[in-house]
Amino acid sequence: MKKTKTILDILKMKSDGEKITVLTCYDYATAGIMDGCGIDMILVGDSAGVVCAGYDNTLPVTMEEMIYHTKAVMRANPKALVVSDMPFLSYQIDLATARLNAGRLIKEAGAAAVKLEGGLNVVATIEAIVAMDVPVMGHIGLTPQSLHRMGGYRVQGRKDEQAEKLLADARAVEAAGAFAVVLEGIPMRLAERITRELTIPTIGIGAGPSCDGQVLVIHDILGLCEKYSPKFVKQYVDLKPIMAEAINSYIAEVKGGAFPTEGHSFH
């Protein structure tokens, strides 16, 4: 029987030079498909607020929503390592609040690890959560919960001063005890340097091919997002017309009396 991946497996993948595959997931059915394909990590992202709930950004997402989505994913009994996002205001207020909410994602929702955004500014938070024996994944660069400070979704680290700040953030996140770090929306050469200097895995999203792993939003690779698709996204299939064809066929058959047939009925 295939064993469930742990953070030790993910760390070993970096040392072995094996690329780490990560996708977001928010529901039971998709988690089962994903896990059957052998994905290494599942990220229950606060991006659920955008792709599932229709919010303009991730800021409105609540702890209750993250627990709901994480529980749904965990019911598929995935062998992938499941990481749950800590939403905005779940860890920024104080360390006690951060510890409580991280613990809820593990105890109530069933995740194996949590992810939070920030660098030097969240070192104490990462340390406090790790001290509870809760694994933490960091997230630096383009951090969606900081979109107002950044003036929107902009590539970070193009200037030398910004690049050095991000390198310091990456080192700080590792030193604080994170087992991995997401690098989002940064120049590929900077991501390559960070990946080379850290002992923990880097998971890229819009950070080039040199990261130890890659993560994308599942709705993006399936062509299910109606909103703007960033440059770093690769759409592997366009499911929208396939879904529309099935729905249109259903509507036509019901309207025309072709469904249900006797074979779909009880006697």
UniProtKB/Swiss-Prot annotation:
It comes from the Bacteria. It is an enzyme of class 2 (transferase). Keywords: Cytoplasm, Magnesium, Metal-binding, Pantothenate biosynthesis, Transferase. Its main location: cytoplasm. Belongs to the PanB family. The active site is at E184 (proton acceptor). It is found in: Cytoplasm. GO terms for cellular component: cytoplasm. Its cofactor is Mg(2+). 3-methyl-2-oxobutanoate binds at D46, S47, D85, K115. Pathway: Cofactor biosynthesis; (R)-pantothenate biosynthesis; (R)-pantoate from 3-methyl-2-oxobutanoate: step 1/2. CDD domains: KPHMT-like. The keyword Endoplasmic reticulum does not apply. The gene is panB. GO terms for molecular function: 3-methyl-2-oxobutanoate hydroxymethyltransferase activity; magnesium ion binding. Homodecamer; pentamer of dimers. SUPFAM superfamilies: Phosphoenolpyruvate/pyruvate domain. This is 3-methyl-2-oxobutanoate hydroxymethyltransferase. InterPro entries: Pantoate_hydroxy_MeTrfase (IPR003700), Pyrv/PenolPyrv_kinase-like_dom (IPR015813), Pyrv_kinase-like_dom_sf (IPR040442). It comes from Geotalea uraniireducens (strain Rf4). It catalyses: 3-methyl-2-oxobutanoate + (6R)-5,10-methylene-5,6,7,8-tetrahydrofolate + H2O = 2-dehydropantoate + (6S)-5,6,7,8-tetrahydrofolate. It holds the Pfam family Pantoate_transf. One of its GO terms (biological process) is pantothenate biosynthetic process. Its EC number is 2.1.2.11. Binds 1 Mg(2+) ion per subunit. Catalyzes the reversible reaction in which hydroxymethyl group from 5,10-methylenetetrahydrofolate is transferred onto alpha-ketoisovalerate to form ketopantoate. Mg(2+) binds at D46, D85, E117.
